[in-house]
C-alpha cells in the first residue's frame, strides 16, 4: 500500500468512527502530531507525542465540533510524505484544512502536522 492509499484508508476509518482500527493499524506508537498554536489556546494546539496523547486530543473533537466530517479533495506525495487538502465540516463550520503526514517503514503514520482553519473552528466550537 503506498502512502496515498494508506492515507485514504486512515481518513475512511476516521470518518466511520472506527478509531480502534485507525489507531491500531494506521498510527505509529511514537507518532508526533503537531497542531500549530500555543498549547491551551485552541483545544487541539500543541505537540502531541505518542499514540495515547493523540487519542486524548482527538477524543475532544465530537463534543466540541458536533457532526465533524472530513472529505479528501486531493493529495500529493513524495516518497513517504503526503499532503492532503481536505473539506472540513461540522455544525456551523464549512472550510478547508491541509494535513501533512510522514509514514514509517512499517506503513504507519509517524508524523502529522495539521494546517486547519482555526478561526472557523473557534467560531463553530460548542461551548
Question: What are these regions, as identified by a protein language model?
Answer:
Residues 1-127:
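C-terminal and inter-domain tail/linker signature
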Amino acid at each position: 500500500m503506498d502512502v496515498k492509499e494508506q492515507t485514504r484508508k486512515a481518513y475512511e476509518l476516521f470518518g466511520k468512527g472506527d478509531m480502534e482500527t485507525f489507531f491500531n493499524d494506521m498510527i505509529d506508537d511514537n507518532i508526533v502530531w503537531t497542531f500549530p498554536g500555543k498549547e491551551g489556546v485552541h483545544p487541539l494546539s500543541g505537540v502531541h507525542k505518542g499514540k495515547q496523547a493523540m487519542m486524548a486530543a482527538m477524543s475532544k473533537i465530537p463534543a466540541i465540533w458536533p457532526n465533524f466530517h472530513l472529505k479528501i479533495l486531493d493529495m500529493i506525495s513524495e516518497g513517504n510524505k503526503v499532503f492532503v487538502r481536505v473539506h472540513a465540516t461540522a455544525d456551523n463550520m464549512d472550510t478547508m484544512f491541509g494535513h501533512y503526514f510522514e509514514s514509517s517503514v512499517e506503513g504507519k503514520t509517524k508524523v502529522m502536522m495539521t494546517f486547519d482553519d482555526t478561526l472557523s473552528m473557534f467560531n463553530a466550537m460548542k461551548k
